[in-house]
Amino acid sequence: MQLRTRLSLEYCTVLLESCIQSKSLFQGKLIHQHLLKCLHRTQETNLTNFDVPFEKLVDFYIACNELKIARHVFDKRPHRPKNVVLWNLLIRAYAWNGPYEEAIDLYYKMLGYGITPNRFTFPFVLKACSALKEVSEGREIHFDIKKDFVLSNVYVSTALVDFYAKCGCLDDAKEVFDKMHKRDVVAWNSMISGFSLHEGSYDEVARLLVQMQYDVSPNSSTIVGVLPAVAQVNSLRHGKEIHGFCVRRGFVGDVVVGTGILDVYGKCQCIDYARRIFDMMGIVKNEVTWSAMVGAYVVCDFMREALELFCQLLMLKDDGIVLSAVTLATVIQVCANLTDLSMGSCLHCFAIKSGFVLDLMVGNTLLSMYAKCGIINGAMRFFNEMDLRDAVSFTAIISGYVQNGNSEEGLCMFLEMQLSGINPEKATLASVLPACAHLAALHYGSCSHCYAIVCGFTADTMICNALIDMYAKCGKIDTARKVFDRMHKRGIVSWNTMIIAYGIHGIGLEALLLFDNMQSEGLKPDDVTFICLISACSHSGLVADGKYWFNAMTQDFGIIPRMEHYACMVDLLSRAGLFKEVHSFIEKMPLEPDVRVWGALLSACRVYKNVELGEQVSKKIQKLGPESTGNFVLLSNMYSAVGRWDDAAQVRITQKEQGFEKSPGCSWIEISGVVHTFVGGGYRSHPQLAQISNKLDELLVEMKRLGYQTESSCVFQDVEEEEKERVLLYHSEKLAIAFGILSLSPDKPILVTKNLRVCGDCHTAIKFISLVTKRDITVRDASRFHHFNDGICNCGDFW
């Protein structure tokens, strides 16, 4: 019986070897079943005969990518195997396929059983460590390698170089590399590819490539390692150098090298070179090549060409080229950039049919596409249907809500993301901070800032720019400046953001000083800088400075003014009441004035009650086609201010006939991290209705005692004065301020945000409220910030 069992086991081992070659899972499982029966029936006390077939069984399951079953067989084997080869097989499988933690865990179990690793064990474990970026574990294994005297082995040393380089420990990688007695092409390639992964490493990579040629000849894998470093610097010269090197060495025929060079040309914005490489590759092109060419078109902003190429790729499916999720996601992103909902929807259907819709990357780009096309409800429906979501999924939906004007929902999704246990990324904060800025939600903005500090995101310029904007729009201009001053690196956007922040707060002199500082640091202003600067001069009444910099923009900096610059200049001159100069300026404009230019002039006509000019300007706007309700409101206000009620009513009728609905006045205030919203006349919806109403009545009595009179012209309806007074009393900003007085201690400033311009009566009333209550009150309206203190507003009563 024992002899028969032994023969049966030997036969099973031979059969399993055959199954490994043929990857026949079904046959292998039958042999596994037979081995278990033999093990159950055997009466032998020594089970060592079963070691070889069970080890071969583990090898078989690894070959068939059935890692879970392989591990189960390994753990349940009759004897603990002392064969280091078997341990290496399983460690290698985990190192290549994951979970990588299991490879490291097996390594330590192996040591615990007294099994000595060999020169093949260490490279596999180090590969798992590099995948996990487990530097401390890798250093311990390095110590074990030194202890076992295998550092002289080129295979082990190369693995150490690769591990340290991929983990960013470049000095350690260089130290190991320099100590190697012998370096083959694989060792050099590991060093080069490892350095290529890290920003700013091109010079070192180029130096290594030159040194390598004195030792061994580079191969195509060397070039594949060099190309990421070239792509990082986006240098066409370096790209051409590597391309020439490949031509001389005969590497251009390699599909991987050709695809890499194509990718470099795309990232260098040299689409013609990229397309030439693509066409020269002929039939050797694979799916990655096609995907790289599509990506190159996207990087160079040739979106339609990217779609056309994708359609060509779909027709090649019968030629064996298989579409990948990466390519599909790239093309869906193209539809998002073009806001091509029709094509995007077709690709969504294709993703469903092909099964790619289950891919997380494809799902995230579909979310982004629907959001950018304005179909936020469709994006949310798809988001709810997703089986798996990550930080990118939440970021896409948050960004969609914010971009489509629903910051409150975006903030709610941000909170849901955190409750789901998913940590926000840099891109998430870059989407959330504008929502906080729009809502003036300082509590959430400050919390996001703290999170950014903890995660090290404040080193990112984009995050700092968003923080400056958020703090400025939450009324904390000093905090915004602190963020600006502490930035490690300030780009032109950073300076522009800070200049416009000073502008909307009416601190034009600081904006001018900052502009001087920017030039002192050697940074050249762009066209947006001058829009910010002239706007800041306009809000602060700095007419001479605004005129000077408008002229200097062309004469000293060679920047041709755009329509936005002319609109800012018209606003600057109009605010100062210089109507003759405005008229002359508009006549001399090389561009035909648009609605923005005439709208700026109409706003001044309202303030100065220049009805005649206002009517002329309004006709110009009507001829061009008004873009929003704002200009209708300005004209209606102007008629109401001089008692021309019929004309004011006619403007509102025209507004409705042309399909422009006036947005209801809405104001909000943040108290203890909760944003409270008030709609004009809609105070009844608030739970503290009675207290708010009583506080407003109390304030009205005190204000009248100090000389306050309602500006009834701000009521468009021709009704009794008493009724006008009640209508004005319940404007949204007054409701929010009254709630702030009730909710905040007297030493706390009040910040209210409004979606429209503050009306004249509210502006006057808030000056009186600041005088009565002895409180600092800040109101951010659609135009600027109004800082009220002791009955005075910093806008000088012009907004």
Task: Describe the function of each predicted region.
Residues 1-184, 190-799:
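Terminal (and in a subset, N-terminal) low-complexity or junction segments at the ends
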